[in-house]
């Protein structure tokens, strides 16, 4: 029942998501109906003609050759050839035949058939051969007689001559050639008579070509040879004529041709979009990790697939029902698209195809984890699986059954063949019926409709198996892969028995064994919601075991938040995955509310709430729907859902967003909803993985409040990288390292165990006395330690055990504040971050905790030597002083950076090597660049060779037995003895051949019309010939009737009659077996095939364009990637010139293009394509290809600006290349055919399309080939020259001629295009177009700026900000040169519907050795400021100066003095850390001899040496940020911009980065930094400003801002409660009384957290009061901190309006 409920829920979810994507759903419905509509429109447009009466044809005489043989051939006389020439019998018979006809001809004997074939092929007079009679007997002697069982074949001209004189005059048009001896019926049957207007039956021309006349003459000559006198007498009494079967009333319907050819394509196109949608939808859930989350909530994988399958099946059912209706409904006069087919069978066929399409889409989806890439590749694969049908269709009649079935393993080919069969059955007149399921269309065919349906279902099953297997073995990023042979393992099917280590009773206390000094005592009065006992997890990575967690034992209590901390890889996520049942544990137990995780997961999940690190939200479900969906998934009953959802919305404060889709929610609201999903349905156990990641300070606070409210009756496990979050939320904090639990206890307990004490920070006045301060501090607190002395701040560490001395210290400092030159001072207690770092170091070094002296907030150069030694030990820095600082000092003295030409050459080399590294590392792409063109061309040349090789028609025996068992009606209206005798002999002869003779007593033709009407299309296969014997006076007339629906029935009918006569004359042993074996092609026909080589050139060009479409697109990938990750911008900021950047790329890409081009020449040589390999034309082809490369590569660069994702760029540019090349090429080529009469338009379009390199390449290759073959033929002989003149076939002596078919204009165009596209590229890159636009908009923008500034200037300006502005507005030249960065009234307005003032007149000077922090909420203008300062955005007004150079006018010089670390890592995944630093060192102009030393120093300073030679893509987030910072620092730029440099780093990595930045600052660099981390700003910044709505609202040192804007203190205290129940209450009452207005922030487990307000409270007073209260109230421990910088920051929150999505 639960399964059914889950399935229904998933179907509801899928249906809702589909319903919300209105455009997609409409398109999915519309496209199939559109294509069905096209067929209906064609059905209505194409007029069918009703023929109400039977069509009866006249008799055809076969006594004489057709009239055109009366005219002599070009050679002079007709020749009648025979083989073998040495046989007297053969000669006699041939001479007899010659005398039979009244035309002038001579007999020509050949000793062997090979000689005859050579004569036909190579003798230019061979067109005079009328026919050849070849006897299939070995005459050993000339006198050998002809046996009674005669076998011979007739060989007529390959090209049917009666058509020769009716040609269109265009030799390039393909004539209907050959005798169709490979098939008995046409590929597509017709519902009416084949060639209804031809009494002689038309193609292949047995009567009009004289074949029957010759056949009858030879047969008569054989009879005369064996019975001369009797034969003579018989022929006098008898006449043989032929006649075409009459045809019953019919409807002539040309529409059926459209059905036969277009139905497969239209069906494929109908389902394409839906297939792509399926792929995208399924992969999107995987990409967004929704599938993994639903699995954690207890959803089975098979249910997930089943729900998708059912949903799409039901959708397809609706679509195909409509399609069937449109196909089968009568649109006019009882005519439909499929008039005769059974609608239920059509529906069954379409459903089978739908099922296979769904399965195919599922299969494709398993190979990808990115939805856009999956859809792009899926689209390509979907089309690609249809292309084999293009090869199958023309060869259908030649293919064996197994080949057809094999090709049907591609569902699109199976569908196409099924649609083709439907078309054939419709043309046959019966339509497809259930009774025809196992019957082929005709005797030629060996394939039936039932096999199509079977193959479609088999395909679905196979694709399903592949889906199941691939998902298990390659589950993607978020699953556990099975071994490749998992399906052979019994454990997969039967479950895996688990080894239980150290099984204990559930009730026992798991932590007793582990209790030591770092584990705080367990709370006695609380219930453990989660008990973890000796839990371990080992992962198998290759052949090695990797320990995930080891022997974890921990209790988590109800009503508490337990915070789990640890570095990346410490085991936090593994622990959560085990507790949620995503992986099974290797050993140990965990109990959640008494249920064991290995056995009772279904029960556990009912009360489990999960909030993964990422938002588990469906873009198109509303807030309420999410809560409803997940509540139901957890098992909440349908009746309770509405109330639960309503309550949860209230708790989350999201009532007003109830019906808003999740994609429109802000980041903070999304996290709230994710937490709501975890809370819903009464989840008693919550697991929250970094619930506030990616949120700003305001949103984070809101989540903290929510969790504090909701924890009362729940067990909460939370992980975080924010230590302040752990400090504030964690009732108990557990720290994991290397998979093992290191400590556990309250925040206060851990700080007491691991903390260093208090950090006291003093802000100095200009006349400050640091020595005096230091003496005073050490006098009161002897073991105090100087922490840092940098900028305007001085900081000390005061040990915690000295708190009783703090009152006197602070009192003395307050008293002597002015005397010592102290502007302000404050203190903060040890943070959780320090605890965390210390635990990590303890694990890493196995040192005693007391021996670890942790560098505190300020990571500065003045740290003690022991600190350096420790870091060296930890990080492998052998000589820490020789870091960035040392390098800088050294360089300032010795190093002169390259400039001018040397710098440009160095930068060119750096950029060139970057491209080379990309090709080297992305070898798969390089392989594709080479293999795709080679494969395309090779396949094309193979296909051309295979298809254009016009094989000589094979021999076909003209016998009824070829058609299987047939009915032969005959009538004997004649009463003569001869007629009776002939009819009896006919019966005997047919029965002997196992045919079915049927005597018709009435009129034979009426009988044939009646049977054809009754039997429909089946009649044409069962009845092929008929005979009648009439008397006409003394003469008996034997009529051989033939059913013209079969190609060879005329000759077969005559063969039966002639055999009948022969047997009458010579007895039953006599027989004549005749075959049709067309002649081989002669010179003229081969010449025509040379002209078809023109078509071959077209095919080569077409395939080359397909190959180049894929190859050319690859040149956009790196361009888009570099721009998307901002690496290109950072390279420009690092000093590289636009021309250097693009020309180096172009040079490498042209070299890359040259490789496949040369290999293409090898392929042409291998296939011996003369046009490109003879007469030095290889050089011409290489020139064409390289000019194409020169033109297309800059075009790809230019078009890369339209895309922000490399995969999208690649797929869409490939489509662009295909359309701009193939579509235009085909269009122009078709219009050039004279018969189309659009030659003038084709010339115009050809000139228009010259701007497209793809079109130029296609036309150039095609024209070159055509010109070569035409010229070669037309100059080969006088006869060829005569034909060329006669048919006006043109060629050019010079291949580079401007006129067609020369390639001059295409070559010129490609050469010019490259230059034009590069010019456009530089115009865009140098912002010339933007500058023009800026100039035009300048006046309007100034007015807008003034108006916007008036609007925003409401609040009075802060005094510090005003003073900074006034200093900058009156600058001196010296101060400008000495100050690394001056920002002067900088403003930015974005032109949009409502103009946005992003930055408003900010002014600032950053001095040497200063680190300036830029703080602000999202949308405050920080990033816009950075973009203007680095030249990425234009400046609206104001200016900025770097080293005295203006950003507006000297951006090139400015960039040489600037380092930049963008917010998101602008790194190139294909390079190593060392390679990137070397590249940027070159860009900065560091001399080559010094680069290695410089890079080594940077790596050492960044602690990146162990990772230096690893690819950047393998780096952790922290290492990437370090490398980004290193790039900003290398080359010693005067000003360094760091945009959120420590985002996503764990605390250890963050500290190391701070250290690097601090050392750079101390070396004299000016640093500007933005950050969301207030702690980071306190650690690094000497001054900072808070930005609101584009303006500075305050400015000064961190301590100055805290003293100016902050008020009050933060107090945490732990009270002993042993033996005294109300001790805590007494202490709370004391605080309320002593500190009026104090706010109780949090209370848990004998701990309280207060905010103490008031500016009048001094540090001395606070410590004095608390020291006295310590004994009186049993206070175990307490800590006091000044209000944090974060609280100052939050005090400005109300001034910032809600941000727009662009977050400027």
Curated annotation (Swiss-Prot):
Native organism: Mus musculus (Mouse)
Variant or mutagenesis effect after changing residue 292 to V: Knockin new born mice are healthy and survive into adulthood without overt signs of respiratory distress
Site (Cleavage): 174-175
Amino-acid positions noted as binding ATP 1 in the UniProt annotation, renumbered to this chain: 566-573
Subunit architecture: Homooligomer; disulfide-linked.
Role description: Catalyzes the ATP-dependent transport of phospholipids such as phosphatidylcholine and phosphoglycerol from the cytoplasm into the lumen side of lamellar bodies, in turn participates in the lamellar bodies biogenesis and homeostasis of pulmonary surfactant. Transports preferentially phosphatidylcholine containing short acyl chains. In addition plays a role as an efflux transporter of miltefosine across macrophage membranes and free cholesterol (FC) through intralumenal vesicles by removing FC from the cell as a component of surfactant and protects cells from free cholesterol toxicity.
Phylogenetic placement of the source organism: Eukaryota, Metazoa, Chordata, Craniata, Vertebrata
Catalyzed reactions: a 1,2-diacyl-sn-glycero-3-phospho-(1'-sn-glycerol)(in) + ATP + H2O = a 1,2-diacyl-sn-glycero-3-phospho-(1'-sn-glycerol)(out) + ADP + phosphate + H(+); a 1,2-diacyl-sn-glycero-3-phosphocholine(in) + ATP + H2O = a 1,2-diacyl-sn-glycero-3-phosphocholine(out) + ADP + phosphate + H(+); ATP + H2O + phospholipidSide 1 = ADP + phosphate + phospholipidSide 2; ATP + H2O + xenobioticSide 1 = ADP + phosphate + xenobioticSide 2
CDD domains in alphabetical order: ABC_subfamily_A
Record GO terms (molecular function): ABC-type xenobiotic transporter activity; ATP binding; ATP hydrolysis activity; phosphatidylcholine flippase activity; phosphatidylcholine transfer activity
Tissue: Highly expressed in the lung and moderately expressed in the kidney, adipose, macrophage, and spleen.
Pfam families per the UniProt record, alphabetical: ABC2_membrane_3, ABC_tran, R1_ABCA1
Name of the gene encoding the protein in the UniProt record: Abca3
Similarity comment text for this entry: Belongs to the ABC transporter superfamily. ABCA family.
Positions of transmembrane segments: 22-42, 261-283, 307-327, 344-364, 373-393, 405-425, 447-467, 925-945, 1100-1120, 1144-1164, 1183-1203, 1213-1233, 1245-1265, 1310-1330
Record note on domains: Multifunctional polypeptide with two homologous halves, each containing a hydrophobic membrane-anchoring domain and an ATP binding cassette (ABC) domain.
ABC transporter domain residues: 530-763, 1381-1614
Location in the cell: Endosome, Multivesicular body membrane; Cytoplasmic vesicle membrane; Late endosome membrane; Lysosome membrane
Name listed for the protein in its UniProt record: Phospholipid-transporting ATPase ABCA3
Enzyme Commission number(s) from the entry: 7.6.2.1, 7.6.2.2
């Amino acid at each position: 029942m639960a399964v059914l409920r889950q399935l229904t829920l998933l179907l509801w979810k899928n249906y809702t998501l589909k319903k919300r994507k209105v455009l997609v759903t409409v398109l999915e419905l519309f496209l199939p109906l559109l294509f069905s509509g096209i067929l209906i429109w064609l059905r209505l447009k194409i007029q069918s003609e009703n023929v109400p009466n039977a069509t009866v044809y006249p008799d055809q005489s076969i006594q004489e050759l057709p009239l055109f043989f009366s005219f002599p051939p070009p050679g002079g006389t007709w020749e009648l050839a025979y083989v073998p020439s040495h046989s007297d019998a053969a000669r006699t018979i041939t001479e007899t035949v010659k005398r039979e006809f009244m035309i002038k001809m001579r007999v020509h004997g050949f000793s062997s058939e090979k000689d005859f074939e050579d004569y036909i092929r190579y003798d230019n007079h061979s067109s005079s051969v009328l026919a050849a009679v070849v006897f299939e007997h070995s005459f050993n002697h000339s006198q050998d007689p002809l046996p009674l069982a005669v076998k011979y074949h007739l060989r007529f001209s390959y090209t049917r001559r009666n058509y020769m004189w009716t040609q269109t005059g265009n030799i390039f048009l393909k004539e209907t050639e050959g005798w169709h001896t490979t098939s008995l019926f046409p590929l597509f049957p017709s519902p009416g008579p084949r060639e209804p207007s031809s009494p002689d039956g038309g193609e292949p021309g047995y009567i009009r070509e004289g074949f029957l006349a010759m056949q009858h003459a030879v047969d008569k000559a054989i009879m005369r040879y064996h019975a001369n006198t009797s034969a003579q007498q018989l022929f006098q009494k008898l006449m043989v004529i032929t006649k075409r079967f009459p045809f019953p009333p019919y409807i002539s319907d040309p529409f059926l041709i459209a059905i036969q050819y277009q139905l497969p394509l239209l069906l494929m196109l109908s389902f394409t979009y839906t297939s792509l949608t399926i792929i995208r939808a399924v992969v999107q859930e995987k990409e967004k990790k929704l599938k993994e989350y639903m699995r954690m909530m207890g959803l089975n994988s098979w249910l997930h697939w089943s729900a998708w399958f059912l949903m799409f099946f039901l959708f397809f059912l609706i679509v195909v029902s409509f399609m069937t209706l449109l196909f089968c409904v009568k649109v006019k006069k009882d005519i439909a698209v499929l008039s005769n087919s059974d609608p239920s069978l059509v529906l069954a066929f379409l459903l089978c195809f739908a099922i296979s399409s769904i399965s195919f889409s599922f299969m494709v989806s398993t190979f990808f984890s990115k939805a856009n890439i999956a859809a792009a590749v899926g689209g390509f694969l979907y089309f690609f699986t249809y292309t084999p049908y293009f090869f199958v269709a023309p060869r259908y009649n030649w293919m064996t059954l197994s080949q057809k079935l094999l090709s049907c393993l591609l569902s699109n080919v199976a569908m196409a063949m099924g649609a083709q069969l439907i078309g054939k059955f419709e043309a046959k007149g019966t339509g497809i019926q259930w009774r025809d399921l196992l019957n082929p269309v005709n005797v030629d065919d060996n394939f039936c409709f039932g096999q199509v349906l079977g193959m479609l279902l088999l395909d679905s099953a196979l694709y399903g198996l592949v889906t199941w297997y691939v998902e298990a073995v390659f589950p993607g990023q978020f699953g556990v892969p099975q071994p490749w042979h998992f399906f052979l393992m019994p454990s997969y099917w039967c479950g895996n028995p688990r080894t239980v280590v150290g099984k204990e009773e559930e009730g026992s206390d798991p932590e007793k064994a582990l209790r030591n000094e770092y584990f705080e005592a367990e709370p006695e009065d609380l219930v453990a919601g989660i008990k973890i006992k000796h839990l371990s997890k080992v992962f198998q990575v290759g052949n090695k075991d990797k320990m995930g967690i080891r022997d974890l034992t921990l209790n988590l209590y109800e009503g508490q938040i337990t915070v789990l901390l640890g570095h990346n890889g410490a085991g936090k996520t593994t622990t959560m995955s085990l507790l949620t049942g995503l992986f099974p544990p290797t050993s140990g137990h965990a109990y959640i509310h008494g249920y064991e995780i290995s056995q009772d997961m279904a029960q556990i999940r009912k009360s489990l709430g999960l909030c993964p690190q990422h938002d588990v939200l469906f873009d198109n479900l509303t807030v309420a729907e999410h809560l409803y969906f997940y509540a139901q998934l957890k098992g909440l009953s349908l009746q309770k859902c509405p109330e639960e959802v309503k309550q949860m919305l209230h708790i989350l404060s999201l009532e007003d967003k109830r019906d808003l889709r999740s994609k429109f929610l802000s980041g903070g609201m999304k996290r709230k909803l994710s937490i709501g999903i975890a809370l819903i349905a009464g989840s008693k156990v919550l697991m929250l993985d970094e619930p506030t990641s990616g949120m700003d300070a305001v949103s984070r606070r809101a989540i903290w409040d929510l969790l504090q409210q909701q924890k009362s009756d729940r067990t909460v496990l939370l992980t975080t990288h924010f230590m302040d979050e752990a400090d504030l939320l964690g009732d108990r904090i557990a720290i994991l390292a290397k998979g093992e639990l290191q400590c556990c206890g309250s925040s206060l307990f851990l700080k007491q165990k691991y903390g260093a004490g208090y950090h006291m920070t003093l802000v100095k006045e200009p006349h400050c006395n640091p020595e005096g301060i230091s003496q005073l501090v050490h006098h009161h607190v002897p073991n105090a330690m100087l922490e840092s002395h940098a900028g305007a701040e001085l900081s000390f560490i005061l040990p915690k055990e000295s708190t009783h001395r703090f009152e006197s210290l602070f009192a003395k400092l307050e008293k002597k504040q002015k005397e010592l030159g102290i502007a302000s001072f404050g203190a903060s207690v040890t943070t959780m971050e320090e605890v965390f770092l210390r635990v990590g170091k303890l694990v890493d070094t196995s040192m005693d905790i007391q021996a670890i002296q942790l560098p505190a907030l300020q990571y500065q150069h003045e740290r003690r030597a022991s600190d350096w030694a420790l870091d060296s030990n930890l990080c492998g820095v052998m000589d820490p002083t020789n870091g960035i600082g040392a390098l800088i000092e050294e360089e300032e003295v010795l190093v002169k950076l390259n400039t001018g030409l040397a710098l440009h050459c160095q930068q060119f080399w750096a950029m060139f090597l970057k491209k080379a590294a990309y090709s080297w590392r992305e070898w798969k792409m390089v392989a594709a660049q080479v293999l795709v063109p080679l494969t395309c061309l090779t396949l094309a040349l193979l296909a051309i060779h295979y298809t254009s090789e016009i094989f000589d028609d094979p021999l076909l025996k003209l016998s009824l037995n070829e058609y299987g068992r047939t009915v032969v009606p005959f009538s004997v209206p004649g009463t003569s003895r001869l007629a009776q005798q002939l009819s009896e002999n006919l019966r005997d002869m047919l029965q002997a051949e196992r045919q079915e003779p049927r005597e018709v007593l009435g009129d034979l033709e009426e009988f044939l019309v009646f049977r054809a009407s009754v039997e429909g299309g089946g009649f044409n296969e069962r009845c092929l010939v008929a005979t009648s014997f009439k008397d006409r006076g003394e003469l008996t007339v034997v009529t051989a009737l033939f059913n013209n629906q079969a190609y060879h029935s005329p000759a077969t009918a005559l063969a039966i009659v002639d055999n009948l006569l022969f047997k009458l004359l010579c007895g039953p042993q006599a027989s004549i077996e005749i075959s049709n074996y067309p002649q081989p092609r002669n010179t003229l026909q081969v010449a025509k095939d040379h002209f078809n080589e023109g078509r071959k050139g077209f095919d080569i060009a077409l395939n080359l364009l397909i190959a180049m479409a894929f190859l050319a697109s690859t040149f956009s990938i790196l361009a888009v990637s570099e721009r998307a990750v901002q690496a290109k911008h950072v390279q420009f900021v690092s000093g590289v010139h636009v021309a250097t950047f693009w020309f180096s790329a172009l040079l490498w890409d042209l070299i890359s293009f040259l490789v496949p081009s040369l290999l293409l020449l090898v392929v042409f040589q291998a296939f011996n394509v003369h046009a490109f390999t003879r007469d030095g034309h290889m050089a011409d082809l290489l020139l064409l290809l390289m000019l194409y490369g020169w033109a297309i590569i800059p075009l790809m660069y230019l078009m890369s600006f339209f895309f922000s994702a490399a995969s999208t760029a690649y797929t869409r540019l490939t489509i662009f290349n295909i359309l701009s090349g193939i579509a235009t090429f085909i269009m122009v080529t078709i219009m050039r055919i004279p018969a189309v009469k659009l030659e003038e338009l084709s010339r115009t379009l050809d000139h228009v399309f010259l701007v497209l390199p793809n079109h130029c390449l296609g036309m150039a290759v095609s024209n070159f080939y055509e010109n070569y073959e035409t010229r070669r033929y037309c100059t080969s002989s006088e006869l060829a020259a005569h034909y060329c003149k006669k048919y006006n076939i043109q060629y050019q002596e010079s291949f580079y001629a401007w006129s067609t078919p020369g390639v001059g204009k295409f070559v010129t165009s490609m050469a010019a295009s490259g230059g034009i596209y590069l010019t456009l590229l530089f115009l865009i890159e140098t912002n010339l177009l933007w500058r023009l636009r800026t100039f035009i908009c300048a006046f309007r923008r100034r007015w807008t700026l003034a108006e916007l500034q008036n609007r925003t200037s409401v609040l009075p300006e802060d005094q510090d900000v005003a003073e900074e502005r006034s200093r900058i507005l009156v600058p001196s030249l010296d101060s400008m040169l000495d100050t690394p960065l001056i920002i002067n009234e900088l403003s930015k307005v974005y032109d949009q519907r409502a103009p946005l003032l992003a930055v408003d007149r900010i002014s600032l000077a950053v001095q040497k050795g200063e680190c300036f922090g830029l703080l602000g909420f999202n949308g405050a203008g920080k990033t816009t400021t950075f973009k203007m300062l680095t030249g990425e955005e234009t400046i609206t007004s104001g200016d900025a100066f770097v080293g005295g150079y203006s950003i507006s006018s000297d951006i090139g010089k400015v960039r040489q003095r600037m380092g930049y670390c963008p917010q998101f890592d602008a790194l190139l995944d294909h390079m190593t850390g060392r390679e990137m630093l070397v590249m940027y060192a070159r860009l900065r102009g560091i001399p080559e001899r010094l680069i290695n030393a410089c890079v080594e120093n940077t790596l050492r300073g960044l602690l990146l040496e162990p990772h230096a030679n690893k690819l950047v893509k393998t780096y952790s987030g922290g290492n990437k940020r370090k490398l980004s910072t290193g790039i900003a620092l290398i080359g010693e730029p005067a000003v360094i911009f760091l945009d959120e440099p420590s985002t996503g780093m764990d605390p250890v990595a963050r500290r190391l980065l701070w250290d690097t930045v601090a050392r750079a600052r101390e070396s004299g660099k000016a640093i500007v930094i933005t950050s969301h981390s207030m702690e980071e700003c306190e650690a690094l910044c000497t001054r900072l400003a808070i930005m609101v709505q584009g303006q500075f609202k305050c400015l000064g040192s961190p301590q100055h801002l805290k003293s100016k804007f902050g008020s009050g203190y933060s107090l945490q205290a732990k009270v002993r409660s042993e033996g005294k129940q109300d001790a805590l209450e007494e202490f709370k009452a004391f605080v309320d009384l002593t500190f009026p207005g104090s706010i109780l922030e949090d209370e848990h487990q004998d701990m309280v957290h207060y905010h103490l307000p008031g500016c009048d409270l001094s540090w001395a007073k606070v410590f004095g009061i608390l020291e006295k209260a310590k004994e009186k109230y049993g206070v175990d421990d307490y800590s006091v901190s000044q209000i944090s910088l974060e609280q100052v920051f939050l005090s400005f929150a109300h001034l910032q309006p809600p941000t727009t999505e662009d977050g400027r």
